[in-house]
A protein has these predicted regions:
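Active-site-adjacent structural elements in enzyme catalytic cores
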Residues: 1-70, 78-90
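Conserved phosphate-binding catalytic cores of ATP/NTP-utilizing and phosphoryl-transfer enzymes
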Residues: 1-18, 100-123
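Gly/Thr-rich phosphate-binding beta-strand-loop-beta motif of the actin/hexokinase/Hsp70
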Residues: 12-32, 121-145
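A contiguous, well-structured pocket-lining segment that forms one wall/lid of small-molecule binding clefts
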Residues: 23-53, 57-58, 180-204, 208-317, ...
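Short glycine-rich phosphate-binding loop at a beta-alpha junction
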Residues: 67-80, 314-325
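Conserved phosphate-binding/catalytic loops in two-lobed NTP-binding clefts
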Residues: 76, 95-106, 318-322, 329, ...
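Glycine-rich phosphate-binding/hydrolytic loop that grips phosphoryl groups
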Residues: 104-126, 131-132, 171-180, 289, ...
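Short beta-alpha connecting loops at secondary-structure transitions
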Residues: 152-165, 205-209, 344-350
Length: 373
């Protein structure tokens, strides 16, 4: 019987007990027993000592209450996460193996677990950032997922992260990255004159210094918000994206920008032309609400075309949507509607949120399938 505070999901796959240690943000723990998965309440963001202590105590409690002896410990691919370090220490103590699971693979797997999908699926994972198998920050991924295996079919065309993680807190930096990508880097200093680091960021982008490339959809939203002058600095996660969504909802439905996106020869989705259109909309004389609505509609249209193309190419019978960007109801509803018009069967998170709180379930599901290889 599940603890009253834990969430229980019955799986279609069974095996030795798995302990999954989740992600860095919105951490949860998942423990499996036979074909039952038990997901803990939210542990929280692992940057604090309190959250790390809660993780330790949560694992101890769950193993005790469910009389579980894990046979494997699953964790995120990122080596610096506390959850990863805990997983290795716990496994070493019990002399059991660990399994590193790619972040976006786990996002899609969590929905597969919830919807009892045992066949291969086409997965669209959209979020802030998760470490990819190529050691770069992913976040706008089209994946072919078959149990413990996955293949990256395509991704959003990358943008630079000037200053690395700092760019995730400062949307103006992502806007600067968009300007540089569109060969308008010479505008950065004047456009962001109120930012003391503007000149430094312009030099960084021009010289490609401390500017890792990311395929993140969350950072694309930040770039749009920064270009429109809606948000320059964020005080909490996804603040700029939520402001952009709120403006778009105020305006109402619009048609997507004609030729606002391109699917490249190597199956990447490029929104350069959309960003280019937004660059000249920052002035007060432009309707920012309309621009925000145009951004949402064009992103949804591009994603739908991208998914449809790959679904036909790979003969996908199921499409899975997951990742924190799907908290955005406007994007979620528009994309789901467009895909439904194409008669594509869509599966989205229902019992758990689309964000990183479901990562542990996905890790556990993958580990159970890995044991069957």
């Amino acid at each position: 019987m599940a603890n009253l505070h834990d969430h229980r999901i019955t799986l279609t796959v069974s095996g030795p007990s798995v302990l999954a240690c989740g992600a860095w943000l919105k951490n949860t723990i998942c423990l499996t027993q036979n074909n039952q998965a038990y997901i803990s309440p939210l542990v929280g963001d692992l940057s604090t000592i309190d959250a790390r202590s809660r993780l330790d105590k949560t694992v101890q409690r769950m193993c005790r209450e469910y009389s579980a002896q894990p046979a494997v410990v699953a964790h995120d691919l990122h080596p610096d996460f506390y959850s990863t370090q805990f997983a290795h220490a716990f496994a070493q103590q019990l002399n059991i193996p660990t399994l590193a699971v790619q972040h976006h693979h786990a996002h899609i797997a969590a929905v597969c677990a919830e919807h009892h999908l045992s066949q291969p699926v086409l997965g669209l994972a959209l979020d802030g950032i998760g470490l990819g198998i190529d050691n770069t920050p992913w976040g706008g991924e089209l994946l072919w997922v078959d149990g413990a295996r996955f293949k990256r079919l395509g991704h959003l065309t990358t943008l630079a992260l000037p200053g690395g993680d700092r760019a995730a807190q400062e949307p103006w930096r992502m806007a600067a990255a968009a300007l540089a990508r569109l060969n308008r880097g010479y505008e950065i200093v004047q456009r962001f004159a109120n930012q003391p680091a503007a000149e430094t960021v312009a030099v960084m982008l021009a010289s490609n210094l401390n500017c890792p490339q990311t395929s993140s959809m969350g950072r694309l939203f930040d770039a749009a918000a920064g270009l429109l002058g809606i948000s320059s600095i964020q005080t909490h996660e996804a603040q700029a994206a939520m402001q952009l969504q709120h403006l778009a909802e105020q305006y109402g439905p619009v048609h997507a920008l004609t030729e606002g996106y391109q699917i490249t020869e190597n199956n990447n989705l490029d929104f350069s032309s959309l960003l280019s259109a937004l660059i000249d909309c920052h002035d007060e004389k432009y309707d920012h609400a309309y621009a925000a609505a145009l951004f949402h509609a064009t992103v949804a249209a591009g994603l739908a075309a991208w998914v449809e193309k790959s679904a036909h190419q790979y003969e996908a019978t199921h499409v899975v949507l997951s990742g924190g960007c799907f908290h955005n109801a406007l994007l979620r509803h528009d994309l789901t509607h467009r895909l439904a018009e194409k008669s594509l069967p869509i599966h989205s998170p229902q019992q758990l949120p689309p964000d990183d709180s479901a990562i542990a379930l996905g890790q556990a599901w993958i580990a159970l399938h890995h044991n069957r290889l």
